[in-house]
Amino acid sequence: MKIILLGAPGAGKGTQSTSIAEHFGLQRISTGDMLRNAAKEGKPLGLEAKKIMDAGQLVSDDIIMALIKECLSKDECSCGVLFDGFPRTIGQAEALRAEEIHIDHVVEIYVQDEEIVKRMSGRRVHLASGRSYHVMFNPPKQEGLDDATGEPLVQRADDSEETVKKRLQIYHAQTAPLVEYYTMLEQKGESNAPRYHKIEGVGTVEEIRNRIFAALES
């Protein structure tokens, strides 16, 4: 089984990707991890990708596809894979089909933007320990202070409302065409078209996980 998992920042994709991979015995492939590992191992493609990333540029689809094909050839991927954060563009999706890497399911964890802004902009952290709080869902005993040390909590720059909204705009611009691409493949009855599942991402971790499992097992 090969699954693509989509979800906006703050939609809970990271939590659910682990559960899906464990439940179905899949190897999780994250392009970010894959690029970092290839560079760390000193592979030519990895070093080339690192040079591009260090220059602040986007790694080409050709390099990413070559690394993905290499990953898929490994024994640990023989039982199936979960693509986390890939594809990001129509070009990458078409490259998968051109390489005859057939996807069985595309799962999008959907959460409204207002809810994501509320989730992410409410996060507060104690930098020294990494302890995390939320002003609404998991507040500290004393507002703005770490429970254990009494030291001030901070909001990371990535979690500011303005930054979260910008990240959501980028996500929607990338993902909307992908969703349309995969739903059209399914509607046209194209050969090896994956099934697309839009999963409501509001609820407990267990509720959302069960919705995903039910969709994939139906």
Curated annotation (Swiss-Prot):
Tell me any Pfam family this protein matches: ADK_lid
Major site of localization recorded for this protein: cytoplasm
Give the enzyme's main class according to its UniProt record, as a single word: transferase
Kindly state the subunit structure of this protein: Monomer.
Record family assignment: Belongs to the adenylate kinase family.
Name under which the protein is recorded: Adenylate kinase
The entry's free-text remark on domains says: Consists of three domains, a large central CORE domain and two small peripheral domains, NMPbind and LID, which undergo movements during catalysis. The LID domain closes over the site of phosphoryl transfer upon ATP binding. Assembling and dissambling the active center during each catalytic cycle provides an effective means to prevent ATP hydrolysis.
Q: Where is this region: NMP?
A: 30-59
Q: Which domain of life is it from?
A: Bacteria
In this chain, the stretch annotated as LID covers 122-159
Q: What does this protein do?
A: Catalyzes the reversible transfer of the terminal phosphate group between ATP and AMP. Plays an important role in cellular energy homeostasis and in adenine nucleotide metabolism.
| Binding annotation for ATP | 10-15, 123, 132-133, 203
Any idea where this protein resides? Cytoplasm
* Pathway involvement of the protein, from the record: Purine metabolism; AMP biosynthesis via salvage pathway; AMP from ADP: step 1/1
The root-end lineage is: Bacteria, Pseudomonadati, Chlorobiota, Chlorobiia, Chlorobiales
Detail which positions bind AMP.
Answer: 31, 36, 57-59, 85-88, 92, 156, 167
Its cellular-component GO annotations read: cytoplasm
Q: Which UniProt keywords apply?
A: ATP-binding, Cytoplasm, Kinase, Nucleotide biosynthesis, Nucleotide-binding, Transferase
Q: Which Gene3D superfamilies match?
A: P-loop containing nucleotide triphosphate hydrolases (3.40.50.300)
Q: Which PROSITE patterns match?
A: ADENYLATE_KINASE (PS00113)
Q: Which GO terms describe its molecular function?
A: adenylate kinase activity; ATP binding
Q: CDD domains from the xrefs?
A: ADK (cd01428)
GO terms, biological process: AMP salvage
EC number, UniProt record? 2.7.4.3
Which reaction is catalysed here? AMP + ATP = 2 ADP
